[in-house]
Design a protein with these regions (language model features):
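Radical SAM enzyme core and accessory elements
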Residues: 1-126, 136, 204, 420-491
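Short beta-strand motif preference
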Residues: 51-54, 171, 287
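N-terminal [4Fe-4S]-dependent radical SAM core
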Residues: 99-102, 122-169
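Conserved catalytic motifs of the protein kinase core domain
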Residues: 166, 256, 433
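Canonical Radical SAM [4Fe-4S] cluster-binding loop centered on the CxxxCxxC motif
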Residues: 166-201
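Conserved non-cysteine loop/helix-boundary elements of the Radical SAM core domain that shape
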Residues: 187-387
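Amphipathic, soluble alpha/beta structural segments
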Residues: 220-229, 410-414, 477-491
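A structural motif corresponding to the C-terminal lobe/cap of the Radical SAM core domain
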Residues: 310-323, 332-466
Length: 491
């Protein structure tokens, strides 16, 4: 779709609105107007920012307008956020009138809808008032308003237990047995990169030691620890033991309330590895089947069977892990609403106290996009999610965190569900941006959060294992950035 921006250059904001209504369209800024185009104009006065969109699509034209008060707002970040709100609301109203469709999340396009609601509640709104804003201003559906409000309240509860010196620690293991069709994460299959494993672990251990010194010297406190990937359990039991020994030796985890390892794929899980995790203090693991349908597992490149998943869950629960999560994905190739329903119903019998329901995100570089694999329609994905919500609630689960992603099927969401008291705190901390996340390992993204000053900064590690091994100076640079940020924050 040809986009003509006038009075602003907020391409990203408009592109996200475009994606919500027209996922097959791509933004174009050069050339003549075609059959589909939009003029998006910003008028900014002393008191108000007004967005006006005139949109033509499918032979229809509609005009949308939105006005947002900016008088008295001096903070540059906040003024820009309000300007973008006016633009996005104007585009939403025009697109809704042209298509006759209102997306489930209405005019909201950000990846953290619960954070928006949490901010409303922190600013003094009641849940009922926040609900009205979601309904009247953003046109969010009742089901999504409920998800956002419940997740926001979980975020408020998690935040109440935090101290200024609290951070979380993340360690990435960028190896998998094979690469799934939906995946674009920077992870290498073990069969292709086995020779890098030992040098990678040596480099990671050195970084753990340096990071441990920095955290101690800066007076920070580890609140939660999460090891993800990739698939951490591609490591052997002895490799895992050595790495976790280094973690426990170099970090003071006496205040750590959550020690989570993403066990991931059932074909990498065995008793010896799980015992290593328990011995080092892990109280939470994640077993991620994604689906229990054999044809879906085959379509996404998983070599394990549904029976392997059942055995892995039996093993994990019998060994006494306090918390076990299972990840499912709605919208995978070859899946159907009936197949997803069977998967969820079966997973609910396995004893997990956390179930995370993801919506397929169409990521650049994934085999789904590269090979054009057929996927379920947005209507079928909606049917899957519409089944999951009441089915999980009936079994005592409630939503506690959610986020959205770009190019997500049907413009839906990912939701973490749990039994009361089993919330995965790391998930809340990172998605609600409640405190800093120190990320170690290849592909790591360290997020530094100063909630008091509404300041967030990021530094990124080298993406690939070999690059990570060869660039220790970049790791040192990132640790020093983290140190400086928190020293400034403490002043």
């Amino acid at each position: 779709m040809k986009l003509n921006l006038r009075g602003h250059e907020d391409r990203y904001a408009i592109e996200q609105s475009l994606l919500a209504f027209f996922p097959e369209e791509r933004p174009v800024y050069e050339g003549e107007d075609g059959d589909s185009h939009a003029d998006v104009t910003l008028h900014e006065g002393n008191a108000y920012a007004t967005g006006v969109t005139t949109l033509t699509y499918g032979g229809k034209t509609a005009r949308g307008e939105a006005r947002v008060r900016i008088a008295g707002v001096s903070d540059a970040y906040e003024r820009e956020r309000l300007r973008q709100r006016a633009l996005k609301l104007s585009f939403f109203r025009a697109a809704r009138d042209v298509t006759g469709v209102t997306p489930s999340w209405g005019a909201l396009t950000g990846i953290r809808p619960a954070k928006l609601v949490r901010t409303m509640l922190e600013d003094g709104m009641t849940p009922a008032q926040a609900d009205r804003v979601l309904r009247d201003t953003y046109c969010v559906s009742p089901a999504r308003r409920r998800l956002a409000l419940e997740s926001a309240e979980a975020g408020l509860k998690a935040r109440s237990d935090l101290r200024p010196e609290d951070i979380s620690l993340y360690i990435g293991i960028p190896f998998c047995p094979t690469r799934c069709a939906y995946c674009s994460f920077v992870s290498a299959s073990v069969e292709k990169s086995f020779k890098l494993m030992e040098p990678y672990l040596a480099a990671l251990t050195a970084e753990v030691e340096a990071a441990g010194r920095m955290v101690k010297e800066t007076g920070l406190r580890i609140k939660s620890f999460y090891m993800g990937g990739g698939t951490p359990t591609t490591l052997s039991a002895s490799q895992m033991d050595a790495l976790l020994t280094a973690v426990n030796r170099n970090f003071d985890l006496s205040d750590c309330v959550e020690y989570c390892i993403e066990a991931g794929r059932p074909d990498t899980i065995d008793r010896e590895k799980l015992q290593v995790l328990l011995d080092h203090g892990a109280d939470r693991i994640s077993v991620n089947p994604q689906s229990l349908e054999p044809r879906v597992l085959s379509a996404i490149g998983r070599k394990h069977s549904p029976e392997d998943i059942e055995k892995a869950m039996e093993l994990a629960t019998s060994m006494g892990f306090p918390h076990v999560n299972m990840d499912l994905i709605a919208g995978l190739p070859a899946d159907t609403p009936e197949g997803f329903r069977r998967t969820l119903d079966t997973c609910l019998t396995f004893g997990a106290d956390n179930i995370t329901v993801h919506t397929l995100s169409l990521k650049k570089g994934s085999r789904i996009l590269l090979e054009g694999l057929p996927i379920p329609s947005a209507e079928d994905v909606a049917a899957m999610l519409d089944y999951a919500d009441p089915a999980l609630r009936e079994k005592g689960f409630a939503p506690y965190y959610l986020y959205r992603q770009k190019y997500m099927s049907g413009s839906f969401e990912n939701v973490g569900w749990c039994i009361s008291g089993a919330e995965g705190l790391y998930n809340i901390y990172i998605m609600e941006e409640l405190h800093s996340i120190l990320s170690l390992g290849a592909g790591g993204s360290t997020k530094m959060v100063d909630a008091k000053r509404n300041r967030i900064e990021r530094v990124f590690h080298p993406k690939f294992p070999l690059e990570y091994i060869q660039r220790p100076e970049k790791l040192t640079e990132n640790l020093e950035a983290f140190r400086r940020f928190h020293q400034e924050m403490a002043r």
